[in-house]
Amino acid sequence: MERLVCVIIGYVCGLLQTGYLYGKWKHIDIRQHGSGNAGTTNTLRTLGWKAGMITFLGDFLKCVVAVWIVHILYSQAYPEELALLSMYAGMGAVLGHNYPFYLKFKGGKGIAATAGLIFATNPMMMLIAAIVFWVIVGITRYVSLGSLTIVVLFVVEVVLYGQ
């Protein structure tokens, strides 16, 4: 039951669509421009650096907040399961970001939210991921390749180290 509660907590946190809300503030539906995505990269390309950074921060923090709430709720009762429950909350936040019910399940791609999950569960891995991301993007000029590489690294880290 705790796992389901953590996913729901995460999903609710993930529903905050920073790019969509910023776009609405500027009288633009970000999903009608660029790639049609409500995430950081499309917001950056469509509305500029300021909007992109605000969106990144909001998308990043939604996972951090979800994990923080789970720590507050479960650290005393389930200390041995806290890492797992944190992952459930973080993955719920990514799902809420990618599939917000109030936007007909059309959100972002979850990269900034996943970065927040990596940071919240393993800050050292986040440092490594950021370096790898920027090296790949710097060499290839493809944000998507850097993003996919980070997701793969995170999955490998979780499988190998159980984090």
Language-model regions, residue ranges each:
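Alpha-helical transmembrane segments in multi-pass membrane proteins
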Residues: 2, 6, 10, 15, ...
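Alpha-helical transmembrane segments within multi-pass membrane transporters and channels
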Residues: 9-30, 54, 136, 140-145
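Cytosolic, membrane-interface loops and tails of multi-pass inner-membrane proteins
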Residues: 20-51, 107
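Interfacial segments of multi-pass membrane proteins
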Residues: 44-49, 70-74, 110-140, 152-162
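A cross-family phosphate/adenosyl-ligand binding-site feature
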Residues: 55, 77-78
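Membrane-helix exit/interface motif
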Residues: 68-77, 99-103
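Interfacial loop-to-helix junctions that mark the boundaries of transmembrane helices
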Residues: 78-84, 118
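Membrane-helix interface "capping/anchor" motifs
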Residues: 100-106, 135-149
